[in-house]
Curated annotation (Swiss-Prot):
Entry's Gene Ontology cellular component terms: plasma membrane
Organism whose genome encodes this protein: Roseiflexus castenholzii (strain DSM 13941 / HLO8)
Record EC number: 7.1.1.-
Enzymatic reactions: a quinone + NADH + 5 H(+)(in) = a quinol + NAD(+) + 4 H(+)(out)
InterPro entries: NADH_Q_OxRdtase_suD (IPR001135), NDH1_su_D/H (IPR022885), NiFe-Hase_large (IPR029014)
UniProt protein name: NADH-quinone oxidoreductase subunit D 2
Localization, UniProt: Cell membrane
Length: 374
């Protein structure tokens, strides 16, 4: 009688498709996956402990290095937590500038994520190059505003580092003229490719009940059919005054996660249009009076207490929990990283599929190991 034997194979920690040092222990029967266990920690850098021995503002550059694609969003989440803890208000103009930067970040992230996944799937470099083209234009805007293309360190407690330079909005408008055609072109490349459809439709399905049980958030959750978005569930900044839709999927497979990200780029475009229209009517302001004595005391000292702030980052719900003992350093600093939590159902999503599908399913989650391991 013919018998088969289960085999354990390792994918990673050094593997081009994991986009970082990440290991998967895969148990297979032939080519079919029976079990998959993700192994994290190879990029652990002690982020939270470093923040607990640093002043509050010294932690801001560290957040840039959590998810290096989304440094503006990371800055935003920490700024909200400290402002909540210290009772700091933010001028309306700074709020709109923050939203503008985060939505540009969302377009940058999703264009890169979809492009990288297509490239991993089989050398489809054309969509990747299209995504990189738009990403470069957005990075030019970031450099114009903050002086850095990636690790921007642009947000401050009570606002942003500086106002937008005069040439920023004209260059942003020029970028936005080409975005609708880019979205359509990007989507057409996906929908009309038979190979891509065969690799993504009904692959890596994450049922909504399983997604909720794992506390998944972001595009991965919405692709499973749950319309949860922190910008709507608990509006922060000026999102409560902006008009945008929350796209959701119906199946929760890799293909749905593709389409959700493309539609979210369109919604970010809508938000940017509204922000550009309202910015001329806003005024900036000086740093909040609550921070007036910081120069004398050398560092911000929030009153004793705790605060949790969360945002809808491009990868999901990003949260910062801070505990203050009244000193210039946080007593406790905790990060809720969406990449880490969204990665936990990977085994359930891969079970029953082929080994070749692991790369596709992992890429559709969109993780950055700096945020996973911290």
């Amino acid at each position: 009688m013919l018998q088969t034997q289960e085999l354990q194979i390792n994918i990673g920690p050094q593997h081009p498709s994991t986009h970082g040092v990440f290991r998967m222990i895969v148990t297979v029967d032939g080519e079919t996956i029976i079990d998959l266990k993700p192994v994290f920690g190879y990029l652990h850098r002690n982020h939270e402990q470093l923040a607990e021995v640093s002043t509050y503002i010294q932690s801001m550059p560290y957040t840039d290095r959590l998810d290096y694609f989304n440094s503006m969003a990371n800055n935003h989440a920490l700024a909200l937590a400290v402002e909540k803890l210290a009772g700091i208000s933010v001028p309306q103009r700074a709020e709109y500038i923050r939203v503008l930067m985060v939505e540009l970040t969302r377009i940058l992230n999703h264009a890169s994520a979809v492009g990288f996944l297509l490239n991993d799937m089989g050398a489809w470099q054309t969509p990747l190059m299209f995504g990189m083209r738009e990403r470069e234009k957005i990075l030019d805007l970031f450099e114009m505003a903050s002086g850095a293309r990636m690790m921007c360190n642009y947000f401050r407690f009570g606002g942003v580092w500086r106002d937008l330079p005069p040439e920023f909005i004209p260059q942003l408008k020029e970028l936005m003229q080409g975005l609708p055609s880019f979205f359509d072109e990007f989507e057409r490349l996906l929908r009309e490719n038979e190979i891509l459809l065969s690799r993504t439709v009904n692959v890596g399905i994450l049922p909504k009940e399983v997604a909720v049980s794992y506390s998944v958030t972001g595009p991965v959750l919405r692709a499973s059919g749950i319309p949860y978005d922190v910008r709507r569930a608990e509006p922060y900044s000026v999102y409560g005054d902006l008009d945008f839709d929350i796209p959701i999927g119906s199946v929760g497979d890799v293909y749905d996660r593709f389409l959700i990200r493309i539609e979210e780029m369109r919604q970010s475009y809508r938000i940017l249009q509204q922000v550009i229209e309202r910015l001329p009517d806003t005024t900036g302001g000086h740093i909040n009076p609550a921070m007036a004595n910081i120069g004398k005391q050398k560092a911000l000292r929030p009153p004793p207490g705790d605060a949790y702030a969360r945002i809808e980052s491009p990868k999901g719900e990003l949260g910062f929990y801070l505990v203050s003992d009244g000193s210039e350093r946080p007593y406790r600093y905790k990060v809720r990283a969406p990449s880490f939590i969204n990665l936990t159902p990977l085994g359930d999503m891969c079970r029953g599929h082929k080994v070749a599908d692991v790369v596709v399913i992992l890429g559709s989650i969109d993780i950055v190991m700096g945020e996973v391991d911290r």
